[in-house]
């Protein structure tokens, strides 16, 4: 019995030394971070939150816009990564009166969307860089016919097929300049997944108020990414009137290019409305009357009017918000989904007492 107790003590000591050595060797060789991170509670504004991705936020923004304007929504497009989920999501909302059409190609998609706008619905289409390139001719048609149209570019890596599953903010110049002739149109970009809601809503409002196509820039990071999102109160969203031209019951000729003095937008005349027959199409029209006109002076005037109409949108934008120092040595300009990275970098540099500021170009919410 005495020897048995001694052996047990020796075995206990041996096993304890083995455990000590094993633990020491593991700790000495394992690549374990020694820094401790404490995630503080987020400072969130009061309200009801849900988790949302950019795709759903975009679709909800479109739906809110047509509800507030009493319009119908017609989405026509062609599947392309990473924009396809917008079509998939909207196709499940027939109960809200949403019409979706999967076209045979990108050109047919935007053509159907523009045709829907011509018929009195709000036409929307979506694609990515290669598809937007194919839609260029119809974008020009939307500019010259002055019809409302929302085009969503969910950017990906390019050029050509490029990197379909990777994110890249490389389509800005394509969005601003990618049409033949003088064909300006508003281009706005979402900053976060939740911001896609407000950006989509604002794109619809601009398109209807100013009778113009509007390009909304998103990207794969935004539509697939998620964030906590405070559910907005629809009653606080501004209504906007579609402004359809009413019947012309007089003997006077309808003037399709007679414009709103404030916005320079022409009237939205629905086909089949009595007394509103007029010419429409891709050939230049005469100011006010809408007759076909090849005169150089008239063409210059129409080009300038269309450009000024888009420029007038800036009059309703609030002052630019500056994050950081009001005056400093460096100003960082950012747009789109770089918002989070640029803001975090600015905060870090400000803590090092560097005098710099950040302006993120985005649509105000």
Residues covered by each model-derived region:
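Flexible loop/turn segments at secondary-structure boundaries
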Residues: 82-86, 108-111, 132-135, 157-161, ...
